[in-house]
């Protein structure tokens, strides 16, 4: 159900994006006013504040975005750690069912064991697919808003930051962004129960490949955003893992609150 809701939200956002993009260049319309203008104003203000360094302005904006999203991210880690504690508690029963399921060839017996497994999940109130997609959904309009603010700002596009131009693709930044998100994807698995880790292993490769594919033909400002954001995500993951691994009772509070 959650996957369907997420897909619908993504489609709805795409409709808003397509209907608003034509007006962005003229700085009018709902899409520009809600998503692009805040970044347009922020980029110019911070660029002036840092002596014309729009690259540094993008770094600071990314840090601010990650700090705003941090409570949502930590809540997701908290929920995942709570699930992990419950999965550990039910592991002996789960492994016994899995062993019997592997040994039997009888279709009817397999159906019974699968139902028994579902009953075990229900008994312990565990949903192995409960990932928490809100932080991802929130980021979509943020990334697009920042991208269009840069796209229609000649000053930002012409700015030289470090060794590259913010308005042109840069292969080195593309590779750095991909490497950061590969490591971030691996680190993110640490907060998940073992069952979720198996389901999400492919994500380790899909995420950085998508980042590099988009960055390869986009302005270097985009992989700058992703690189800084990815590093901050890694730090947030370490914070969430350290706190909730050392305080499993706090993680379980999240699961109990959700029940109520």
Q: Where would I find each of the regions flagged by the language model?
A:
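Helix-loop-helix
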Residues: 2-4, 9-260
